[in-house]
Structures are given as C-alpha cells and as structure tokens.
Amino acid sequence: MRPMQGRAVLISGAGSGLGRAIAIRIAAAGGHPVVGDINDAAARATVEMIENAGGSASPARLDVTDSVVVRQVVQATAEQFGPSFDGLVNNAGTDQGAGLLDISDEQWSAVLAVNQSGPLFLSREFLRTLDVSKPREFPADVVNVISISAITVGADAAAYNSSKAALAMLTKVMQREAYEYGWPVRIHGLMPSAMNTPMMEQWHLSNEVMMAPDTVAGAVEYMMTLPPDSFVQNLVINSRREPGWPR
C-alpha cells in the first residue's frame, strides 16, 4: 500500500461534513490536508481539530465556482509543498432541492457551479501543476466525490441529480485522458449514498438510515493508499439500513 505520510492533499468543502472527516483521516495517517472551504471560520475549525489531535493541516479560502480563486489556491499550494502536493479531493457539493416547476434560475446555476464546474476547475489546475516530464515513484491522486444520485432518480432533485450525473461522466473522461495521455495521476470515482451531514437536513431522513461521514472518508483514504498499479474506477457505498437506492 502507498503511505500517506508526508503527502499534501487539497480537499474542497473540508470545513464540515464529509470534507472534514476526510481531512481528519488524512492527517491521522500522516498526511497534511489543505482544508479548502468558502467559509474561513469552518476551515480554521477543521484545522484546529486536527492540530489538537497532534496532526498538521492548513486552511485555504476556496470558492470552487471561481476559476481565478481556484488557480490561485492550487498554485499557492504547489509552491508551498512542491512535489509532496500530489492529492486532490473534489468534495465540495451543494443541494438546493426544488421541483421542476419551482426551481429558479439561481438555484439551478448555483448547484451546477459547485457540483459540476468546481471539480473541473480544481482538477484542471491540479493537473497543470504536475510535471509529466519527470518519472514518479507513485502517481498523484484525484478523488471525485460524486454521489449515488448520479445513478438514481428522485423528485425535487433535478439540479443535484443532473450535476452529479455530469460529474460521473467527467470522471470517466478524466480517467480516459489520464490513460491515453500517460499522466502520472490516478482518477478515482466515489458514489456514496446519504450521509449524516448538514447538507442532508433538508431531506429529513432518519439518522438511522444514513452513513457516518467517517465511513466514506475511510474509502477515500483507501483509494489514495492503493498500490501504484491500481485505481478505483467507481465505488458505490450504500447503507444496509435503507432498502433500495436512497438519496
């Protein structure tokens, strides 16, 4: 297995929920998470939790919908950590539930900007920092946190389901280009079902049927520590406590 020790990993949306759980996992394994979040206070709170537990982390104000900000954050991280910056987790996501007749232009645009454009902006800038001319002992890692909603259908979720389906296809494109162009990077896809995070509060699901964020964070750590000759093309994680395909 590939060690996490000494690796710097940029995580979007790491100020709470799943992103925070991923950052804590990576830090506990010896990595240095760069906690990206549009909420400065939330990012600093995650860093403080990690440092209080004996790990290392740093905050970064990150608006994934702004390609200029994304470029600045990625370049600053690359300048600070050099070759040890070899991990990206596209975790930031948003959901503004509304039916087809009620969803506003602003709601639609906001969800697609975070869930679809954000991973593209971040992945593009991250891949541009990799020196493809030099051999690497281990490939870099990109984990796209998609959602089981990419392959399910739910009422009042047109924007979210559509954006996640688009991210699933983008992940396939990234995987194909990484292979055909010989990039020193692995692109992993992850489709979790409902987790007990603040974003799920609007759907009023029972806590008993949702997964703990740390369960999915463990899957992210697993992907990033696989031997260099393998990657996770697409991993669906579902709760056994909910029949069928929950949100």
Tell where the protein language model's regions lie, with residue ranges.
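Residue(s) in the substrate-gating loop at a strand-loop-helix junction
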Residues: 147
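Active-site loop immediately N-terminal to the catalytic Tyr-X3-Lys motif
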Residues: 101, 152-158
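Conserved glycine-rich cofactor-binding loop
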Residues: 8, 15-16
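Substrate-binding pocket helix/loop in short-chain dehydrogenase/reductase
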Residues: 99-100, 104-112
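Active-site helix of classical SDR
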Residues: 123, 163
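The beta1-alpha1 cofactor-binding region of Rossmann-like NAD(H)/NADP(H)-dependent oxidoreductases
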Residues: 40-41, 61-73, 105
